[in-house]
Each structure stands twice: as structure tokens, then as C-alpha cells.
Amino acid sequence: MIKYLYVILLGLLLSGCQPAEVVEIEASPKAQKRTVLKVGTLYGPQIYVNNSQGETGFDYEMANRFADYLGVSLEMIPFTDRKQLFKALKDNDIDIIAAGIAKTPGRGEQFKMGPTLYKVNQVLVYREGTPEPKDIGTLSGEITVMSNSSSVNTLTQLQKDYPELLWNQVNDKDNEELFALIAKGELNYTISDSNSLLINQRFLPELRAGMILEEKIEVVWLLPPKNSDKLMSQLLAFWHNEQRAGTLEHLNEKYFGHVKRFDYVDTRAFIRAIDNVLPAYRSLFETYSGELDWRKLAAASYQESHWNPNARSKTGVRGMMMLTQPTASYVGVSDRTDAEQSIRGGAIYLKDMIERLPESISDSQRIWFALAAYNIGMGHVEDARRLAVSMDMDPDAWRDVKKVLPLLQQRKYYKQTRYGYARGSQAVHYVDSIRRYYDTLVWVDNQTKKMEVIEAPVEILADKVDANDNIKQSLASDSKTNNTLKPKLGAGQP
């Protein structure tokens, strides 16, 4: 409720003859000094995740930096229902929505929109092994999307050109659940932003990107329609600062830069290896990784040898971590084909690379520089960093150095360096591959932990229906409600 402060100018007391004047001043309930930034969000690998490793995600990191900029604490409030998320913002229960939300006309009418964080395409998603659709007009009734998502807006716009286009909307499933049903063959098609699809292909390689339905959609934060002018001005100032500092580019590279390249066969093989090969060596990775996340060490090992203790290359490197003979001697490995010795030695060498890096490189990025050095040598990595400086780029930012490394293959550039020619593009591919393997390992590890919680203790869950049955039954229920219903123009928009 808006409070009114009545300020009486004591004119009579001051002049002794003037009548009193009453001035009415409106004070917003939000005018009190902010102490907490309440951010509504959705769960998702690129948006917000809270697990044993802590809170991560593009939107989380940006929100955390914004809270620091404001000098307040951050409270992330995850929602599982988009409709409730939007309602919370309208009701001023939260200050901002930071959830990978696409900019649409409907949202622009209801909320204030922050500046663009990044852009995505809306793509049709289908299953590997099924024909790729060529005409959206032939898919009436076969597309399933989330209610209150930008996919509904895309379909509504397409419906103007394809009047018979119909689709299904579900309220109780997110993108990841729809992806899983597509991968199983239980749904035919859905619509997703390109970044979400690329990330989830690392876990569900059966997913395929079909036709692009809408290009370069802006992803933004949402603010309340009223009493948020000050917060919006602060957000704009913060955004300009972060853009100048390269933070947006850094986070885009961190969360999306390594997922652009997708290999169906390789991803399928890796997921099988996690089930069939990794269990024999997991304890060794955990033992020798030390402070390093064991999954990064395991991902590096898979990139090197596909977890084959007897792996051997034409250049003479051998074993799980593909050590050269000089490196093996340096780290105390006598038998490079002994899995435990190789993993221990590889971990020692990788940690040595991390420690040799300049302190100016942040902790979160040191591992990527170290892996590049593991692949082509520390000298070449330092050459790339020096080249970055000469090109007015940041030598401590992996996003910049990964652009420079391929230049070490061009005489124009490597003749300026101390260590000469190097296959820099190979090092970039090497690091990106490890990052993708790591993402998949994290996802599988988290899913395993969730299943352990679900499955134990058995007596508590005796009356529960199998999770897959729940999904099928729920989807069937939704289909009865939404199946091939033609929504009104703009239906499903917040």
C-alpha cells in the first residue's frame, strides 16, 4: 500500500502571518534501502544449478556480480513453473527474473526488459534416425512445447502463415524433460533455443537440430512493470561496465563457447564408456586428483586415451594420460601402461602446469590454460599470451587466448614468438573437447546421485510409481487437455 507523507511547511511559525501549506509526497514501499537482491530463476545447466559443487550458471554468475555491484546479498529463488515465476515478478515478490528468458512482444507489454545478454535461434528438435522435417506446416499436432515459453510465441507467429498449425502445451515439464522424451522416441518434436539444445546434446546425443524457426532472439532479464526505474538504471550501468570489462563475452565463452561442435558418434561412445569403462578407474581419478575436480582429470584422460591403459600414438606417447618418456621420468612413472601410475603421473604434471601459470590468471580459468599447456607445451601457451597482448587482447582470459592459439600455425605470427610454430588449433580443440566431456560427466554424476536418493530407502518409496511411468501418464494427461488445441493468438505468453 502506498503511504503518503504529509509535510506541513510551518509558514506561520516562520513568518507569523502566512497560512500553512500542505505538500503530499508519494513514497514507494520499495524506496527503502535494498539489502537483498531477490532473483527468480529456472533450473538449467546454462541458467542455474545448485549442487555439491555450489551454485553455477550464466544467469547466476551475472546475478551474483550485479548483487556485488549493488552492495547487497543475493538470494536466488528457483521456480519450476514459469507462470508462477512471472506472477512472482508482477506481485513484487522478486526483484528480477534471470532465467534465460527470450524477448517477445507479449513480455514487453507486461514487464520492463533489461539489456541483451546474448542471442539464440529457435530451432525444431527431433530424434536421430527419423526423417528431418522440411515443412513446419506438415507437423500439425506433433509438436509439444512448454506453456508460457517463447516457443509458444514462435508457433503463434508461424500460425499466421500456416493457419492449420496446431501444437500441444504442457505445464509440468521443462526443456530437459521434453528433450528426454524426444530422445526416447516418446515425443516427435519440440522447439528449443539453440544454446539449450547444444548443451543437452552432450547428454542426449539422439537429439537433432532441424529447421531454424526464428533467428537471433535476444535473451534478457525481466523487471517489474512498476516501481523499478531505479533498479533498471542500476542494471543498465552495471551492464555497460560488464560489457566494457569483457564479462559478457567471458561468460558466453564459458557456458556456450565449447558446445558449438557436436559429434554424435563420439558422444554416444563417451556415454557408453562412462557406463562400461570408467567404473574400473574412477577411484584412481578421485584419489590422485587432489584439489582438482576428478571429473576434469577423467575427461582429460578420455581425450588422451579413451581410458585405454595400453593406448599408444605414432609419436611415442603412451598410457591413460598419454605421457612422453621424458614427462614420465619427470613425474616418477616407470611403467606408462600401468593405469594407476599413468593417472598419478598425469595428475602431477597437470597440477604442475597449473602452478606454473601467472597468478594474474583467475582460478576458474587456470585449468583451461594448463590443459592447453599439457597438449602443446607451456612455452607455446606463453607465446600465445604475449601475442594476445600485442593484439590488445587479454592474456589472462581464455576466451582471448583461444582465438590467438591457432595463429601459431601461421608464419606471419609464429616468427615473432620465442618457441615458434605450434598446432594451436589442435590445442583449442583439445581443451574444448575436454570441457564437453567434463560437462557430460557432471551431468551423469548428478543424475546418478538423484537416482540414489530416489531409490533409497526402498520401504519409503514402495508406493511410488516408476518415474518413467509417471512421465508417460503425466504426458498423456496433458495431451488430453492440450492435444491439438489451437491456441488463441498470443496464448501461453506470460
Swiss-Prot record:
GO cellular component annotations of the record: cell outer membrane
Originating species: Shewanella denitrificans (strain OS217 / ATCC BAA-1090 / DSM 15013)
Signal sequence residues: 1-20
Region Disordered, residue ranges: 473-494
Lineage, top ranks: Bacteria, Pseudomonadati, Pseudomonadota, Gammaproteobacteria, Alteromonadales
Pfam families (alphabetical): SBP_bac_3, SLT
Protein name as it appears in the record: Membrane-bound lytic murein transglycosylase F
Entry note about domains: The N-terminal domain does not have lytic activity and probably modulates enzymatic activity. The C-terminal domain is the catalytic active domain.
EC number: 4.2.2.n1
Entry function: Murein-degrading enzyme that degrades murein glycan strands and insoluble, high-molecular weight murein sacculi, with the concomitant formation of a 1,6-anhydromuramoyl product. Lytic transglycosylases (LTs) play an integral role in the metabolism of the peptidoglycan (PG) sacculus. Their lytic action creates space within the PG sacculus to allow for its expansion as well as for the insertion of various structures such as secretion systems and flagella.
One of the GO BP terms on file: cell wall macromolecule catabolic process
Polar residues: compositionally biased ranges: 473-485
Catalytic activity: Exolytic cleavage of the (1->4)-beta-glycosidic linkage between N-acetylmuramic acid (MurNAc) and N-acetylglucosamine (GlcNAc) residues in peptidoglycan, from either the reducing or the non-reducing ends of the peptidoglycan chains, with concomitant formation of a 1,6-anhydrobond in the MurNAc residue
Similarity annotation: In the N-terminal section; belongs to the bacterial solute-binding protein 3 family. In the C-terminal section; belongs to the transglycosylase Slt family.
InterPro entries, per the entry: Lysozyme-like_dom_sf (IPR023346), MltF (IPR023703), Solute-binding_3/MltF_N (IPR001638), Transglycosylase_SLT_dom_1 (IPR008258)
Region ranges (Non-LT domain): 21-259
Its membrane topology: Peripheral membrane protein
Catalytic residues identified in the record: E304
Entry keyword set: Cell outer membrane, Cell wall biogenesis/degradation, Lyase, Membrane, Signal
Primary gene name: mltF
Location(s) in or outside the cell: Cell outer membrane
LT domain: annotated segments: 260-494
Enzyme class: lyase
Entry's Gene Ontology molecular function annotations: peptidoglycan lytic transglycosylase activity
Annotated CDD domains: MLTF-like, PBP2_YfhD_N
